[in-house]
Amino acid sequence: MKNNINLQDVFLNQVRKENIQITIYLVNGFQLKGFVKGFDNYTIVLDSDGKQQLIYKHAISTILPITPINFMQSSKKQGE
């Protein structure tokens, strides 16, 4: 059976686990900076300056991490 990797979940889980700061660009151009505290299929919880924000994924255009994410390392851990 082939393992399907959900790239979105791998990315969000790694920035959450490693406490990597991200910048989220919304479709309206607004920027949010902070740390991912949790996520599900529809939302991301972002901690920004000690305040939590619930962001709907359909409103997100782009997510930029402050450091590069190694997808190969993350996908191996999930496959184990």
Curated annotation (Swiss-Prot):
UniProtKB keywords: RNA-binding, Stress response
Pfam family, one: Hfq
InterPro entries, alphabetized: Hfq, LSM_dom_sf, Sm
PROSITE patterns with a match to the protein in the record: SM (PS52002)
Gene3D superfamilies the record matches: 2.30.30.100
GO cellular component: cytosol
GO molecular function, one term: RNA binding
Domain Sm: 9-69
GO BP: regulation of DNA-templated transcription; regulation of RNA stability; regulation of translation, ncRNA-mediated
Family: Belongs to the Hfq family.
Biological role stated in the UniProt entry: RNA chaperone that binds small regulatory RNA (sRNAs) and mRNAs to facilitate mRNA translational regulation in response to envelope stress, environmental stress and changes in metabolite concentrations. Also binds with high specificity to tRNAs.
Quaternary structure and interacting proteins, as annotated: Homohexamer.
The protein, known as: RNA-binding protein Hfq
Native species: Alkaliphilus metalliredigens (strain QYMF)
